C-alpha cells in the first residue's frame, strides 16, 4: 500500500515538472539590435527564469554596445527559454502564470557539477625568504683509521755544532814520491804599440822680436849672486896690419895734465925693423908730455878673463810685435819610455804547521826581484807608497785553521776553516790595501787553530804586488 502511494507521488512530481517545462517555452524573440558575439563569462549558467539584478545590469551594458542585426544571437542556444536583450519581449501566458509562480521564489541550488579540466600551470612564484637555519645535527660516529701516510721530505740541515777540542798531532807521514815536472807555461801576449801623440796644430813658433830701446840706468843695486860661467865665444878673425905712421916732431913741454883714466891693455905690437946704430948723442932735456892721441882701432880679442860680478837688472823692454810663422822643424828623436815603479812577490810555505802568533815564514821564493819580501822574517816591506793587492791560498788539513792578515801592526782581515780528521781543504783571500812607505804586511795563525799544511802534493802560497803608486802630482797614474 505504501509502495503505491510512493509511485503516485513520483508520477505527480513528474507531471508537474513536465508542465513547468512546457509553460516556460516561448516563441523566438525578435531582435532589433545586433549583440556582439562574446564568450559567455566563466561561471555563468543557463537559467529558466528572468536573470537576477546583477545579470540584468550586465546584459543592459552589453545591449547598449550592440548594433542592429537580423539574426538571433548565438547565445540563444545557451539560454533556450529566456531572452538576453531586450527584456520587453519576455512573455508569459496568463494560463501558465499559475504554474510558473515558482519562478518568483528563490532558485534552489542544483546539484554540484563535475570538476572542470585542470588548468595550465601558473607562472613560477618569487623565491621565498631564507628560512631559519635548523639545529646542528648529531655528531656522527668516529670514522675508521686512515691509511699510513707517505714518507715526508728530507728536512733542512741543522746549524753547525760547536767545534770539538783539537786532536793530537798525528805522526809524521812518510815523504811522498817526487812529482812530475810541470809543463812550461805559455808566454804572455805582447802588448799593443801605443798611439802617437797629437801635434799642436796652432802652436807656431814666432820670429824673434826686435830689441827694445835701452832703458835709463837704474839705481845702484847691491852685489848680485855669482853668475854662472858663460860659454866660450867663437874665435874672432885677426885684423889687418896697420901702416907704420910717420915720426912726429918733437913737441914742447906741455903743462902737467890731470891723471887720465887707465886705458885698456893693448895687444903686443909687432916688432919693428932693426935700425942702424946711431951715434951717441948728448942727452936732451926732458920734453913735456904730448897731447893724448885718438883712440886706436880695436885690436884682436884677448884671452878670456875672469867672470865679473853680476850686473844690475835692467828695466823690462817693450814687447815686440808677433813674428811671422816659422817653418816646421825637423822631427825629434824617439823619447825613452817612462819608468814605472814595480814591487811584487810570491812565496810558498816549506814546512807544515808553522808556529802560532808570529809571522808565517814563506821560505820558498817564487818571485821577489825587487827584494821587498823577506823570507827570514816572513814580512813584506813597503818601499813605494801606493795601492797593493795581497792574496793567499792556504791548504788546511787535520785540524782547524784561523788565519789573519796583519798590516800596519793591526789584524786587518781574518778567516777561519773548520776541519777535522784527515780531510783536506783550501782557504783563500784577496784584498786591496793602501800602504805608505815603511809599512809591513804578513800572515799569522792563532793558537790551537793551526791547520796550515804543505806537502809535495799541496802548496800554501802568499802573494802581493803594487797595483799603482801613490799620486805625486795632480794627474792620476
Swiss-Prot record:
Similarity comment: family membership: Belongs to the OTOL1 family.
Low complexity biased stretches: 298-310
Gene Ontology molecular function: calcium ion binding; extracellular matrix structural constituent conferring tensile strength
InterPro entries listed in its UniProt record: C1q_dom, Collagen, Collagen/C1q_domain, Tumour_necrosis_fac-like_dom
Compositional bias ranges of the Gly residues kind: 182-191
Domain C1q: 338-473
Protein name: Otolin-1
Chief location: secreted
Disordered, as annotated region: 28-55, 111-337
Entry GO terms, CC: collagen trimer; collagen-containing extracellular matrix; extracellular region; extracellular space
Subcellular location field: Secreted, Extracellular space, Extracellular matrix
Domain comment in the entry: The C1q domain mediates calcium-binding.
General function of this protein: Collagen-like protein specifically expressed in the inner ear, which provides an organic scaffold for otoconia, a calcium carbonate structure in the saccule and utricle of the ear. Acts as a scaffold for biomineralization: sequesters calcium and forms interconnecting fibrils between otoconia that are incorporated into the calcium crystal structure. Together with OC90, modulates calcite crystal morphology and growth kinetics.
Entry keyword annotation includes Glycoprotein: yes
Residues bearing the modification 5-hydroxylysine: 178, 310
Gene Ontology biological-process entries: otolith mineralization; protein homooligomerization
Origin superkingdom: Eukaryota
Residues of the Collagen-like domain: 116-175, 209-268, 278-337
Biased composition (Basic and acidic residues): 33-42, 147-159, 226-240, 247-277
PROSITE patterns: C1Q
Subunit record text: Homooligomer; disulfide-linked; probably forms homotrimers. Interacts with OC90. Interacts with CBLN1.
Amino acid at each position: 500500500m505504501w509502495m503505491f502511494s510512493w509511485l503516485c507521488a513520483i508520477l505527480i512530481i513528474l507531471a508537474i515538472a513536465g508542465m513547468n517545462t512546457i509553460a516556460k517555452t516561448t516563441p523566438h524573440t525578435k531582435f532589433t539590435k545586433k549583440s556582439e558575439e562574446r564568450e559567455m563569462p566563466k561561471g555563468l549558467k543557463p537559467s529558466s527564469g528572468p536573470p537576477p539584478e546583477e545579470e540584468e545590469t550586465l546584459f543592459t551594458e552589453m545591449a547598449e554596445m550592440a548594433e542592429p542585426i537580423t539574426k538571433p544571437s548565438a547565445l540563444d542556444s545557451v539560454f533556450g527559454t529566456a531572452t538576453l536583450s531586450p527584456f520587453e519581449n519576455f512573455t508569459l501566458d496568463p494560463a501558465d502564470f499559475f504554474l510558473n509562480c515558482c519562478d518568483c521564489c528563490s532558485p534552489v541550488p542544483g546539484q554540484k557539477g563535475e570538476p572542470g579540466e585542470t588548468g595550465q600551470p601558473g607562472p613560477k612564484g618569487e623565491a621565498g625568504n631564507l628560512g631559519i637555519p635548523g639545529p646542528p645535527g648529531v655528531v656522527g660516529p668516529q670514522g675508521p683509521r686512515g691509511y699510513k701516510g707517505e714518507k715526508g721530505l728530507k728536512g733542512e740541515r741543522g746549524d753547525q755544532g760547536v767545534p770539538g777540542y783539537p786532536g793530537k798531532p798525528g805522526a809524521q807521514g812518510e815523504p811522498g814520491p817526487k812529482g812530475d815536472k810541470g809543463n812550461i807555461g805559455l808566454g804572455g801576449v805582447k802588448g799593443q804599440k801605443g798611439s802617437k801623440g797629437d801635434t799642436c796644430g796652432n802652436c807656431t813658433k814666432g820670429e824673434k822680436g826686435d830689441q827694445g830701446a835701452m832703458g835709463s840706468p837704474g839705481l845702484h843695486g847691491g852685489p848680485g849672486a855669482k853668475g854662472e860661467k858663460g860659454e866660450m865665444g867663437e874665435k874672432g878673425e885677426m885684423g889687418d896690419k896697420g901702416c907704420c905712421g910717420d915720426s912726429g916732431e918733437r913737441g914742447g913741454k906741455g903743462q902737467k895734465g890731470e891723471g887720465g883714466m887707465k886705458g885698456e891693455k893693448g895687444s903686443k905690437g909687432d916688432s919693428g925693423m932693426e935700425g942702424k946704430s946711431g951715434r951717441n948723442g948728448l942727452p936732451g932735456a926732458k920734453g913735456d908730455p904730448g897731447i893724448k892721441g885718438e883712440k886706436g882701432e880695436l885690436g884682436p880679442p884677448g884671452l878670456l878673463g875672469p867672470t865679473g860680478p853680476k850686473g844690475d837688472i835692467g828695466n823690462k823692454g817693450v814687447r815686440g810685435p808677433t813674428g811671422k810663422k816659422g817653418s816646421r822643424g825637423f822631427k825629434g828623436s824617439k823619447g825613452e819610455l817612462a819608468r814605472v815603479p814595480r814591487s811584487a812577490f810570491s812565496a810558498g810555505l816549506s814546512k807544515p804547521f808553522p808556529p802560532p802568533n808570529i809571522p808565517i815564514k814563506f821560505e820558498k821564493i817564487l818571485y821577489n826581484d825587487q827584494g821587498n819580501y823577506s823570507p827570514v822574517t816572513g814580512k813584506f816591506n813597503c818601499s813605494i807608497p801606493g795601492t797593493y793587492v795581497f792574496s793567499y791560498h792556504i791548504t788546511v788539513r787535520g785540524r782547524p785553521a784561523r788565519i789573519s792578515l796583519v798590516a800596519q801592526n793591526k789584524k786587518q782581515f781574518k778567516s777561519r776553516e773548520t776541519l777535522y780528521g784527515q780531510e783536506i781543504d783550501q782557504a783563500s783571500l784577496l784584498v786591496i790595501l793602501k800602504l805608505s812607505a815603511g809599512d809591513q804586511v804578513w800572515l799569522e795563525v792563532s793558537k790551537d787553530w793551526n791547520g796550515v799544511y804543505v806537502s809535495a802534493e799541496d802548496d800554501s802560497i802568499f802573494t802581493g804586488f803594487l797595483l799603482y803608486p801613490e799620486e805625486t802630482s795632480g794627474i792620476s797614474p
